[in-house]
C-alpha cells in the first residue's frame, strides 16, 4: 500500500493518491477482469451507463476545436483533499451502524451463493464512504440510509458468486441489504 513497483523498483506514492479507472463490459474483445486482490483496492464501483442525448451532444461539440481536457482547471488542491478526508473521519458512526455494516459483510461471507465474501478492506470502504456521504449531506453523523445507499457501490465488486448461482454481484448484495 501507498507504493508502486515497476520492474522490481519500489516508488512511494504521493499523499493523497487516487486512481479513477474505467472498465469496458466483459463482452468486449480483449477485456479481462482484474484479480480479486486488485478489485478490492477500489473504494467504489459505479456504473454510469450512457449519457442522455443533450449531454452527449455537448460532449461531441466540445471536441470541435481541440481536446477539452487541455482546458480543465483544478477545483481542489492536494491540501483541500487531505482536509476533506480529515473532516470525513470526524463524522460519527454509531455502534449500531458499525454492527449493521459488519452484519452485511458477514452475510456475504456466510452466503451459500457466494464463493468470495467482502474483505475487511471492503468493510472499511463502506464505513469511510458512509462517513463521506454524511459529510456531503452536511450531517455530523451517519444514518442507515447512507450505508444502504453505498453498500452496492462499495461491496458488489468485492464478492464472487459461485459458478452455478444466478444473479449479478449487484443483485447478491442488494438481496443481503
Task: For each feature predicted by the language model, list its residue ranges.
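Canonical AAA+ ATPase core
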Residues: 1-76, 81-91, 131-133
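Non-catalytic accessory segments flanking P-loop/AAA+ NTPase cores
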Residues: 50-54, 61, 68, 89-93, ...
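Alpha-helix initiation and N-capping motif
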Residues: 52-53, 78-81, 98, 144, ...
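Short acidic/histidine-centered micro-motifs embedded in hydrophobic/aromatic stretches
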Residues: 62, 104, 149-153
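Conserved AAA+ ATPase small/helical "lid" subdomain
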Residues: 71-123
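C-terminal engagement/docking regions of AAA+ P-loop ATPases
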Residues: 110-177
Amino acid at each position: 500500500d501507498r507504493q508502486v513497483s515497476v520492474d522490481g523498483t519500489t516508488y512511494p506514492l504521493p499523499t493523497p493518491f487516487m486512481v479513477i479507472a474505467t472498465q469496458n463490459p466483459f463482452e468486449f474483445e480483449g477485456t479481462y477482469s482484474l484479480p480479486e486482490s486488485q478489485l478490492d483496492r477500489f473504494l467504489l464501483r459505479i456504473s454510469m451507463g450512457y449519457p442522455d442525448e443533450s449531454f452527449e451532444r455537448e460532449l461531441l461539440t466540445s471536441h470541435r476545436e481541440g481536446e477539452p481536457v487541455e482546458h480543465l482547471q483544478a477545483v481542489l488542491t492536494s491540501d483541500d483533499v487531505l482536509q476533506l478526508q480529515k473532516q470525513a473521519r470526524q463524522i460519527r458512526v454509531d455502534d449500531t451502524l458499525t454492527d449493521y455494516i459488519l452484519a452485511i459483510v458477514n452475510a456475504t461471507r456466510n452466503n451459500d451463493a457466494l464463493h468470495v465474501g467482502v474483505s475487511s478492506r471492503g468493510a472499511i470502504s463502506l464505513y469511510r464512504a458512509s462517513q463521506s456521504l454524511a459529510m456531503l449531506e452536511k450531517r455530523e453523523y451517519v444514518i442507515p440510509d447512507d450505508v444502504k445507499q453505498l453498500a452496492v457501490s462499495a461491496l458488489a465488486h468485492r464478492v464472487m458468486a459461485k459458478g452455478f448461482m444466478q444473479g449479478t454481484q449487484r443483485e447478491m448484495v442488494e438481496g443481503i441489504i
